[in-house]
A protein has these predicted regions:
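Short, solvent-exposed aromatic-acidic interface loops
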Residues: 76-78, 195-204
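Broad gene-expression machinery/nucleic-acid interaction feature
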Residues: 29, 39-41, 57-61, 65, ...
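Generic structural motif
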Residues: 37, 67-69, 78, 155-157, ...
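Detector for glycine-centered tight turns/loop "hinges" at secondary-structure junctions
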Residues: 47, 165-166, 187-188
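A short small-residue
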Residues: 69-71, 110-116, 194-200
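Short beta-strand elements
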Residues: 53-66, 169-198
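Acidic low-complexity segments
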Residues: 2-21, 25-41, 81-171, 202-207
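N-terminal alpha-helical targeting/anchoring segments
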Residues: 40-95
């Protein structure tokens, strides 16, 4: 279980589980989907920082299914009043529908990647230094290098799914990307080559 969704709000885990169970009582399926997403990007163009961004988003989605009817509500505010409002909206949509909640879902507890946060494991300065090294190395290879653009992007998502009855499923999803674009110019002719690598891994693969 994760604490990040409940440590800065008036909504407790017990409150959330109670609201979910009451809302999904007469439904066939449904869940509360909580997500905390952080992302960053750094772009170096000809040795200068052209762009550097960071964002952090927190929110939830509440879904209920009865027969062929699917009701959904979402919000960027995780609070008791917000979740209660979403639950009321779903109950209103499904008020004439009755179903039996399916507690038996297939589970595959396989770890496909490490539980890491690539954004926080390395400093911004260390990432910039590597991008500068790429720029200097590439330009030293040939005098016809006209432009070098190198970038890092990283993402980290924490996800928790709470189903009726208090069943909890969690996942942490890291993601990084490293790109290099090089433009060569000779006798008035320009050509560009691009290469990129990445995946659900750590910046340690490159830094």
């Amino acid at each position: 279980m994760m604490t990040i969704f409940f440590n800065k709000t008036d909504l407790s885990r017990n409150d959330a589980e109670k609201i979910i169970s009451e809302t999904l009582n007469n439904c066939d399926d449904g869940e509360l989907y909580l997500e905390n997403s952080k992302s960053e990007s750094i772009l170096l163009d000809d040795g200068k920082i052209k762009n550097s961004t960071y964002s952090s988003d927190l929110g939830y989605g509440l879904r209920a299914v009865t027969g062929e009817v699917v009701a959904y509500s979402h919000s960027n505010e995780i609070s008791k009043s917000s979740l209660k409002q979403s639950a009321d909206n779903l109950s209103s949509t499904l008020k004439s529908k009755k179903g039996v909640y399916n507690h038996k879902i297939p589970k595959r507890n396989e770890q496909f990647y490490k539980n890491i946060n690539p954004i926080e494991e390395k400093s911004l300065q260390s990432k910039l230094e590597l991008l500068k090294e790429v720029n200097n190395y590439t330009r030293a290879k040939s005098g016809i290098v006209h432009q070098v653009t190198a970038s890092f992007s990283g993402e980290h998502k924490s996800i928790e799914i709470i189903r009726s009855g208090g069943e909890v499923l969690t996942d942490v999803r890291p993601l990084i990307r490293f790109n290099v674009s090089v433009m060569l110019e000779k006798n008035g002719k320009k050509e560009t080559g691009v290469y990129g690598i990445g995946g659900r891994q750590s910046y340690d693969e490159y830094l």
